[in-house]
Amino acid sequence: EFSFNGKVVLCYPKIKDGGIDAVVDNFVREIKKTTGVKLVKDRLKDGLFLGLHVEESTKKGDAHIVLYVDEYMLKEAYRLSVTPKRINIAASTPAGFFYAFQTLKQLMPRNVMAGVPDDSVEEWRVPCVFIVDEPRFSWRGFMLDEGRHFYGKEEIKKIIDVMAAYKMNRFHWHLTEDQGWRIEIKKYPKLTEIGAWRDSKVCAWGDVKPDGVRYGGFY
């Protein structure tokens, strides 16, 4: 098992597509929030010397999470190897590293994926595994219809988090139609003043009587 309880250094190189910093920062922030563990970031300008740099650092006794760029892998593919002192992750794009981090979190206690702290966990561990994963389909989508029912910003954020956990990559957001207009356009204010609201709603199957309560909303 790999333990997060000691000092853990996250080493990663600069990649030409950009975006790796945002992926790493998001993972570090989520681990800190859910486990209290503060990962030490170590960003190298030149990935060619990443392996040598890690070997020197490992001699000090630190555990490592190391990101390697493998340009021969598919855009969203990743390779994850967990050993007692090191986690190696290889991918060709920030998306691949992002999905690898999703899998890594799923190997940890369940509160990590839930995004909440758990004070009952005494030691944060990940089992030793070797995983090679790549998508079968390039378009893995979820469609939400808010023309008929308005969910609101916080619920949408939860849905996107769940999509990320399942490694879905397309959010089809249905916002406008004659049943409800959910996006504000300053030039056409009546679209939301009138189109975003209705005077009542039918609450349940078999009960077709409107409730008489004004309903709606927009972004």
PLM ranges: what are they?
Residues 30, 107, 159-162, 166, ...:
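Generic, well-ordered alpha-helical scaffold segments in large soluble proteins
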Residues 144-178, 182-185:
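A conserved hydrophobic secondary-structure block that centers on an alpha-helix together
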Residues 90-91, 140-153, 194, 207-219:
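The substrate-binding groove and active-site-proximal loops of carbohydrate-active enzymes
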Residues 42, 118-121, 172-176, 202-206:
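Short C-terminal domain-edge/linker segments immediately following a structured domain
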Residues 1-139:
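Contiguous, structured surface segment used for ligand recognition
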Residues 135, 179-219:
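Aromatic- and acidic-residue-enriched carbohydrate-binding clefts of CAZyme catalytic domains
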Residues 16-20, 155, 187:
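Single-residue recognition of alpha-helix capping/boundary positions
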Residues 48-58, 178-189:
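Beta-rich nucleic-acid/ligand-interaction surfaces
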